[in-house]
Amino acid sequence: MKLYEYLLEGTKHFTLIDPDKSVDYLKIARYALEAGTDGILVGGSLGIRESQIAQVARDIKSVAHVPVVIFPGSVSQLTEEADGVLFLSVLNSLDPYYIIGAQVHGAVLLAKHYPRLEVISTAYVIVGDGGAAGFVSMSKPIPYTRPDIAAAYALAANYIGFKALYLEAGSGAPQPAPPEMVKAVRKAFPRVLIVGGGIRSGEAARAVARERPNVIVTGTLAEENPEKLGEIVKAVKSA
């Protein structure tokens, strides 16, 4: 089964592992797998080399029975050791580089050097606090009080033809995107919807999952309190 087809099936939980933050990334991966996570995202906003991302993906693939997907913070974070890559365009960045500049560079690299990697075009929309991703990409995060603006971006992503949309509250966000915003984006975008950032409890995960995104991502929690992943995964799958 293709990765994209897998993502379309119901609501799944993915664990984000940032090798720049997680020295013992295999320990986190094992916790996530035992908790029942449906996939692993690998990547981060800062400080990761191509050789590092390749080694991490290879190591995780050796113990994982779920897809390993690159969540790139730069064009250097590519490897065929993974199953696929979210080909991100930061729609609400104020810098054209993060909307299309990096993508032109990355597209050439993918075509020449990583032809077997499944590429999923992904509209990346940063909301709320925005975290490191919002800061690095020079974005103007959408306030949680304006789900209508998030929905407008989702409509644009749909009409442009993105295969996926990632609604990002940011790494370590104090709160996740509110259910009202997820609902509005879900209504406007009919393909793969990914929601991440600020999800630290089963209750928060369940509230987001009820709006039927395709993927719910937890990252900071996996780094700081991996024992709690089971609660999150259970909430996602029981919503």
From Swiss-Prot:
It catalyses: sn-glycerol 1-phosphate + (2E,6E,10E)-geranylgeranyl diphosphate = sn-3-O-(geranylgeranyl)glycerol 1-phosphate + diphosphate. GO terms for cellular component: cytoplasm. Keywords: Cytoplasm, Lipid biosynthesis, Lipid metabolism, Magnesium, Metal-binding, Phospholipid biosynthesis, Phospholipid metabolism, Transferase. Pathway: Membrane lipid metabolism; glycerophospholipid metabolism. InterPro entries: GGGP/HepGP_synthase_I, GGGP/HepGP_synthase_sf, GGGP_HepGP_synthase, GGGP_synth. Its EC number is 2.5.1.41. It is found in: Cytoplasm. GO terms for biological process: glycerophospholipid biosynthetic process. CDD domains: PcrB_like. It is an enzyme of class 2 (transferase). Sn-glycerol 1-phosphate binds at Y166, L167, E168, A169, G170, S171, G172, G197, G198, G219, T220. Mg(2+) binds at D18, S45. GO terms for molecular function: magnesium ion binding; phosphoglycerol geranylgeranyltransferase activity. Its cofactor is Mg(2+). Belongs to the GGGP/HepGP synthase family. Group II subfamily. Prenyltransferase that catalyzes the transfer of the geranylgeranyl moiety of geranylgeranyl diphosphate (GGPP) to the C3 hydroxyl of sn-glycerol-1-phosphate (G1P). This reaction is the first ether-bond-formation step in the biosynthesis of archaeal membrane lipids. NCBIfam families: GGGP, GGGP-family, PRK04169.1-2. This is Geranylgeranylglyceryl phosphate synthase.
